[in-house]
Design a protein with these regions (language model features):
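Bacterial N-terminal signal peptides
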Residues: 5-16
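N-terminal secretory signal peptides
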Residues: 21-74
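Active-site-proximal beta-strand/loop segments in catalytic clefts of secreted hydrolases
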Residues: 42-44, 76-80, 116-119, 157-158
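Short acidic/glycine-rich loop or secondary-structure boundary segments that cap or lie
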Residues: 48-50, 83-86
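Acidic helix-start/capping segments at beta-turn-to-alpha-helix junctions
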Residues: 71-85
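A cross-taxonomic marker for long C-terminal extensions/tails that follow the last structured domain
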Residues: 86-158
C-alpha cells in the first residue's frame, strides 16, 4: 500500500511539473520586443561548468526565438576559460568533444564567440590554437564595454 501511495504521489508530482513547465513563458519581459541583444561574460576554469554555461546560452537563445523575438548574442570568454578552448590540450577526449559540439551549436545559431587576446597572451595561447568558430579579440573588457554601449545587456556567467 505504501509503495502504491509513493507511485501515485510521484505520478501526480510529475504531471503537475510538466503542466507548470508548459505554462511558463517570458511574455511579460519580452512584450513589445522584436529583438534582444546580450553579451555573456564567461569566466570559469572548469570544463563541465563551461559546458553548462554554453547549454544555458543555447537554450535561452532557442526559447527566445520560440517566443518570436530575435536574439543577437555574443559570448565573451576571458581568464582561465581560454585554457579550455585550446584544440591540442591534455584532458578527457569525451569532455572536449562535448565542448566542441556545444561551440558548433552556438555557431550554427549565429552566436558570436570571442576569446580575450589579453588572456591568450597571458596563458601563451595562439589564436590559431583555439577551437574553430571562436574569434580572438584584443581585449574582452573592451568588447564588454563596447557591446554594452551599443545596448547589449551584460549577463555575467561564472
Amino acid at each position: 500500500m505504501r509503495i502504491l501511495a509513493v507511485i501515485i504521489f510521484t505520478f501526480i508530482a510529475f504531471i503537475g511539473q510538466s503542466q507548470i513547465a508548459q505554462a511558463l513563458d517570458d511574455a511579460e519581459a519580452l512584450s513589445g520586443l522584436t529583438s534582444i541583444r546580450a553579451i555573456y561574460d564567461v569566466r570559469t576554469k572548469d570544463e563541465k561548468t563551461l559546458q553548462f554555461i554554453f547549454t544555458v546560452i543555447r537554450d535561452t537563445y532557442d526559447e527566445t526565438m520560440q517566443q518570436n523575438v530575435k536574439a543577437r548574442y555574443v559570448v565573451s570568454m576571458r581568464g582561465p576559460t581560454i585554457k579550455l578552448l585550446v584544440r591540442s590540450r591534455a584532458g578527457e577526449a569525451a569532455l572536449q568533444e562535448k565542448t566542441v559540439g556545444l561551440i558548433n551549436e552556438l555557431n550554427q545559431r549565429g552566436i558570436r564567440l570571442e576569446a580575450c587576446g589579453y588572456a591568450l597572451n597571458l596563458f601563451g595561447v595562439e589564436p590559431e590554437d583555439l577551437y574553430g568558430g571562436i574569434v580572438s579579440v584584443g581585449n574582452s573588457l573592451n568588447s564588454l564595454i563596447g557591446y554594452q554601449t551599443k545596448g547589449y545587456a551584460l549577463i555575467p556567467m561564472n
